[in-house]
Amino acid sequence: MIRTVLAAMALCLAVASPLRAQAAFDETTERAAIFGVVSDMQAAWNRGDYRGYMQGFKNPDVVFVSGGKIKNGWQGALDDYIRNYGPTPESRGTLTFYDMTVEFLAPDAAQLIGHYRLDRPERPMEGINTRLFRKIDGRWVIALNHVSAYEVAPTQQAR
């Protein structure tokens, strides 16, 4: 009899725990947290802090998809940003993320789709990001980042 009661209590706790966790999920708060990550990344990029920019990505095993290639790894991405965008504001440009939407796939997973613009004297860029965010240890990070980029035509640069 005691075993039956203990088994029933264990079953109730097992069922109730996920329900309690889901009830605590506040979509508005979590969406704001994700937008906060992106805002922090934008600010870090614009002050030349590539390492700060990379804090928005899962370390070490983030996946990047861009230019028809799949690249794995946080450190490699950081090295690419430093090499490809350089140390000066002119080479780095000014980054702006905009028109972003977030869809929650689970309490610990969300998809963000948005646009970005990189204003710089040579080769200004614009594109679309599709990002899979995961909540790990209470913090939202990008686990998968897909970019479709294109150079901005000279007539489109003035926004």
Where are these regions (language model features)?
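Positively charged n-region of N-terminal signal peptides that target proteins for export
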Residues: M1-T4
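Bacterial N-terminal signal peptides
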Residues: L6-A16
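Short, low-complexity N-terminal intrinsically disordered segments enriched in polar/charged residues
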Residues: L19-G56, P154-R159
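A solvent-exposed, acidic/Ser-Thr-rich amphipathic alpha-helical stretch
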Residues: A32-V37, Y50-D108, R117, R123-P124
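A short, structured loop/turn motif at beta-sheet edges
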Residues: V102-A110, F133-R139
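Short beta-strand edge/turn micro-motifs at domain boundaries
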Residues: E126-A153
